[in-house]
């Protein structure tokens, strides 16, 4: 039986990476066999692409950015995700295709159709079964990142992150059957409890 595929999404600073780690710990205690990955990265090739994408010294044009993310994603799908799912493992990914929709398609202005075409090739049409979207305001994200060294995308201005959030909220509205919206403005453990509740409800329903 094919394993379940869960992705986490949100603007930079929303706390999704922390929530991925907490969910991983919880599900392992519950006995689930799972593989946790990140984007861009997760493979040797992907991690090299990640270095290029996040380096603030690099001037990267929107189309280049889209293709670099897609190349990392293609490697991750072929090398890690599809083999794990075929073995029945649960796969949790910190960012996936929706990041490209909102960052390159919406915030960079490339358009969703262009991003969709490229990424359908990269992922072989693979989509997460559910996507946990951690929602916070750009103001809160900026506050949380104060004092921390920002990468190339984190260092974008307020308007960019505002567009990213708008893009995510549009996806949540357009694909309610896949997206789970979590209020990320609360403290870490409160958010974790909401994530666990939502994921466990999905997993129980998927077993029926």
From Swiss-Prot:
Q: Name one Pfam family in it.
A: Thymidylate_kin
If you read the UniProt record, what top EC class would you report for this enzyme, in one word? Answer: transferase
- Quote the EC number: 2.7.4.9
Q: Name one GO biological process term.
A: dTTP biosynthetic process
What this protein catalyses is: dTMP + ATP = dTDP + ADP
GO CC terms, sorted: cytosol
Q: Where does ATP bind?
A: 10-17
Q: Which Gene3D superfamilies match?
A: P-loop containing nucleotide triphosphate hydrolases
Signal peptide start and end residues: none
UniProt cross-references to InterPro entries, sorted A to Z: P-loop_NTPase, Thymidylate_kin-like_dom, Thymidylate_kin_CS, Thymidylate_kinase
Annotated keywords:
ATP-binding, Kinase, Nucleotide biosynthesis, Nucleotide-binding, Transferase
Q: Which GO terms describe its molecular function?
A: ATP binding; dTMP kinase activity
Whether Transport counts among this entry's keywords is: no
Protein role: Phosphorylation of dTMP to form dTDP in both de novo and salvage pathways of dTTP synthesis.
Tell me which family the UniProt entry assigns to this protein: Belongs to the thymidylate kinase family.
Q: What is this protein called?
A: Thymidylate kinase
Species whose genome carries this gene: Caldanaerobacter subterraneus subsp. tengcongensis (strain DSM 15242 / JCM 11007 / NBRC 100824 / MB4)
């Amino acid at each position: 039986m094919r394993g379940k595929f869960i992705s986490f999404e949100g603007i930079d600073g929303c706390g999704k990476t922390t929530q991925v780690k907490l969910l991983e710990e919880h599900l392992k205690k519950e006995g689930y066999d799972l593989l946790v990955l990140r984007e861009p990265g997760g493979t040797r090739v992907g991690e090299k692409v990640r270095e290029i994408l996040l380096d603030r010294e690099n001037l990267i044009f929107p189309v280049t950015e889209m293709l670099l993310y897609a190349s990392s994603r293609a490697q991750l799908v072929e090398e890690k995700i599809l083999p794990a799912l075929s073995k029945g493992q649960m796969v949790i990914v910190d960012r996936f295709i929706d990041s490209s929709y909102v960052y390159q398609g919406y915030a960079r202005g490339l358009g969703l159709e262009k991003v969709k075409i490229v990424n359908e090739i990269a992922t072989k049409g693979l989509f997460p079964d559910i996507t946990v979207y951690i929602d916070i305001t750009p103001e809160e994200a900026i506050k949380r990142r104060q004092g921390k060294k920002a990468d190339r995308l984190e260092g974008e201005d307020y308007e960019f992150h505002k567009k990213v959030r708008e893009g995510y909220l549009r996806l949540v509205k357009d694909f309610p059957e896949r997206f789970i919206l979590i209020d990320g403005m609360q403290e870490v453990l409160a958010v974790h409890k909401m994530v666990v509740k939502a994921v466990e409800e999905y997993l129980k329903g998927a077993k029926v």
